[in-house]
From Swiss-Prot:
Glycans are attached at residue 133. This is Gamma conglutin 2. The record marks 296-297 as: Cleavage. Residues 1-33 form the signal peptide. Belongs to the peptidase A1 family. It comes from Lupinus albus (White lupine). It comes from the Eukaryota. Its main location: secreted. One of its GO terms (molecular function) is aspartic-type endopeptidase activity. GO terms for cellular component: extracellular region. Keywords: Allergen, Disulfide bond, Glycoprotein, Secreted, Signal. It is found in: Secreted, Extracellular space. Disulfide bonds join 91-181, 105-118, 110-136, 121-131, 349-390. Expressed in developing seeds and in the young roots and cotyledons of germinating seeds and young seedlings.
Amino acid sequence: MAKNMAQIFPFIAVFLSCSFIFVLSSSQNSQSLYHNPQSTSSSSSKPSLLVLPIQQDASTGLHWANIHKRTPLMQVPVLLDLNGKHLWVTCSYHYSSSTYQAPFCHSTQCSRANSHHCFTCTDSATSRPGCHNNTCALMSSNPVTQEAGFGELAQDVLAIHSTHGSKLGPMVRVLQYLFSCAPSFLAQKGLPNNVQGPLGLGHAPISLQNQLFSHFGLKRQFAMCLSRYPTSNGAILFGDIYDLDNNYIHNSIDVLIDMVYTPLRISQQGEYFMQVNAIRVNKHMVVPTKNPSMLSSYHGDSRIGGAMITTTNPYTILHHSIFEVFTQVFANNMPKEAQVESVGPFGLCYDSRKLSGGIPSVEFVMDSHDDVWRISDENLMVQAQNGVSCLGFVDGGMHTRTEIVLGTHQLEENMVVFDLERSRVEFNSNSLKSHGKTCANIFDLNNA
């Protein structure tokens, strides 16, 4: 017996050593969901707030971000699309990643992405990212040109910054982030230079925030602060921004105490709307002549009333009936001698040198007359040409889908919070400038 034990003891020792190595390896792998590409963080400390820096594109007025994807991680520039259903990028050229996967048709991932069709690739004789057979087909669209096409549902690593007190924390990873490899023609028009596709934040199963909420167990809330200046960053925060223990928003009491809120309505397509019952210019009500109740009525899902919040229109678009009266009331409160020929796409422009008397106040009145969003001078006017300032609102014609489509110029330098748990949208009643702040200086975005 002793002899037999002596013979098998080396095998037991080897087995125990291998088991220890396997347990250690498994422990390390379990931590990889919250792994910083530069340094290791513990899996026991799940992030409560995530940060994505955002920049303005000077040529289009739209906003974009660098997301970190693939293995090894690399920066991928994408357009911010508040109402988009998912992230899509073009994978036809230069997509290199050791962790790319294309889920099989009718798989769990397909169901999660609401993909009910199979994808067959005809572009290439060999398989590559974005080109496999018997995978999931997902419809993607360019939010600027409205072109659309089927692509391949894919999954790969995505990394995003966490926070550590008032500073940026380590990057954390989602190992199987779902997105679409879309046809390359979708990215050829309308998008800022070098952008590879849009990053969707709409109310949809595989939009960015919903995958982050699910993966990290975050509070279902995200905040957006878009910078007016191409040389400085704004940011989107995912998670509980009101948790003062996070302390990430500098002087958060000053920034957040000024917030007012109104119900958040979501269309069947997952787009974000808020009710605007009235527009006031220097306290004068803007009342459409042909339909006085246009702003205060709600039309349901067939034609959503109110204001759609977007990040893919640089300027706010108004239904013609509203635009006509709004510009007339605004012009009545401006010096007539300052008005000049309009510069497209705007309908009302002025000689900047003759505007020393100030700009009329414009307020959007929400469900309650106490809930008012005051649009600052900088958010109202656009420097269309040298020496020419225009009212930054565009005539949308008679057949708009909704009365108001809020554009990025009016949203810049405001904190806008989408509280999906309480179905409400919150915003500063006055721009951050009234507090002496900007989107760039209320966040620490160093080394982002």
